[in-house]
């Protein structure tokens, strides 16, 4: 699951925006 910073940040940003998996990533 290694991706460029831009792609990783984009996916993380979308997930955090939803807030559904924000907790999963946070922990």
UniProtKB/Swiss-Prot annotation:
BP GO annotations: nucleotide metabolic process
Residues bound to ATP: 3
Reactions the enzyme catalyzes: a 2'-deoxyribonucleoside 5'-diphosphate + ATP = a 2'-deoxyribonucleoside 5'-triphosphate + ADP; a ribonucleoside 5'-diphosphate + ATP = a ribonucleoside 5'-triphosphate + ADP
PROSITE patterns membership: NDPK_LIKE (PS51374)
Keywords associated with the record: ATP-binding, Kinase, Magnesium, Metal-binding, Nucleotide metabolism, Nucleotide-binding, Phosphoprotein, Transferase
UniProt key word Metal-binding: yes
Keyword Nucleotide-binding recorded: yes
GO MF entries: ATP binding; metal ion binding; nucleoside diphosphate kinase activity
Biological role stated in the UniProt entry: Major role in the synthesis of nucleoside triphosphates other than ATP. The ATP gamma phosphate is transferred to the NDP beta phosphate via a ping-pong mechanism, using a phosphorylated active-site intermediate.
Record-stated family: Belongs to the NDK family.
Protein name (database record): Nucleoside diphosphate kinase 2
